[in-house]
A protein has these predicted regions:
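A general "terminal functional-core" signal
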Residues: 80, 104, 108-110
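Flexible beta->alpha loop and helix N-cap segments adjacent to enzyme active/binding sites
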Residues: 1-51, 109-110, 114-247
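Short glycine-rich phosphate-binding loop at a beta-alpha junction
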Residues: 97-106, 179
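Phosphate/ATP-binding catalytic cores across multiple sugar-kinase/actin-like superfamilies
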Residues: 75-101
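Generic alpha-helical structural element
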Residues: 66, 74, 78-81, 199, ...
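Gly-rich Lys/Arg/Thr-decorated short loops/hinges at beta-loop-alpha junctions or inter-strand turns
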Residues: 56-76
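Conserved hydrophobic/aromatic pocket- or pore-lining residues that grip, position, or stack substrates
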Residues: 7, 85, 106
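Short glycine-centered, acidic/aromatic-flanked micro-motifs in structured strand/loop junctions
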Residues: 75, 105, 126-128
Length: 247
């Protein structure tokens, strides 16, 4: 995770904040161009770099500076991480045989890589907020020796009133982008309807309009919302209620 944050800084983003942007950038790069450079420099030979990753790695390969270079760095970084994840999962299933896996830590927000887990385990559970906040809850439960049922992620500040379903539908079918702030806020970094920007994906320019409002890069991915019974008509791969896997 620390290394992934360092690479986030290397492509000009904010470490410990923009790792999800790096993950999105990876889809637009060549993962093979710099794969062995990154793997060899950071994990095999250059100990100095390994010991100082908390300071970032802006000094690594200053010759790489174009936009496509940044996309290629992101793609190679994602591939290296997924290679490491394969190794760890293979070790886990070999030495601790089970159908079940619980995945925690900030890296568990990497939904592109998370889908790999189903190659090794039948049942995978990831805390909706798997970073430090989710780990803190786990520590408390371990200390108190209690079990809880996490039925949803709406644990934050509550805005009183009825959820405006009909009003939202009216706005969406008019090809408008709807900002929603209702009910309890989501616990974690992702929005699930209570603090969200919602849009009808059938709009021709809807993607660009949302990006303009959010002031974000054009390559950033979107999270579709669909009823469970229709998922298999449009997507393959594991389903997720909390934006934890990709199709």
């Amino acid at each position: 995770g620390l290394w992934y944050s360092a690479m986030t800084q290397r492509v000009g983003l904010t470490p410990n904040e923009d790792e999800y942007v790096l993950m999105g950038m990876a889809a637009y790069g060549d993962p093979d161009r710099l794969y062995y450079n990154i793997k060899d420099d950071f994990f095999n030979n250059k100990t100095r770099l390994k010991n100082n990753l908390h300071r970032g790695c802006l000094q690594w390969r200053p010759d790489l500076h174009t936009d496509q270079d940044m996309f290629d760095i992101a793609a190679a970084t994602q591939k290296v991480y997924e290679t490491i994840l394969h190794t760890l999962l293979n070790f886990a299933v070999t030495y601790y045989p089970s159908n079940n896996l619980v995945l925690m830590g900030g890296c568990a927000l990497n939904c592109s890589a998370n889908s790999i887990t189903y190659d090794y385990f039948k049942n995978v559970w990831i805390m909706p907020n798997p970073g430090d906040a989710g780990s803190a809850i786990g520590c408390v439960l371990a200390r108190t020796k209690k079990f809880i049922s996490l039925d949803d992620v709406y644990l934050g500040h509550n805005i009183q009133g009825e959820y405006p379903v009909n009003k939202i539908i009216k706005e969406l079918i008019s090809n408008k982008i709807c900002g929603v702030a209702a009910g309890k806020a989501e616990f974690g970094p992702r929005a699930f309807g209570n603090r969200s920007l919602l849009a009808d994906p059938r709009g021709i320019d809807i993607k660009d309009r949302v990006n303009v409002i959010k002031q974000r890069q054009q390559f950033r991915p979107f999270a579709p919302v669909i009823l469970q019974e229709h998922v298999d008509n449009y997507f393959t791969g594991p389903t997720s209620s909390y934006m934890q896997f990709t199709s």
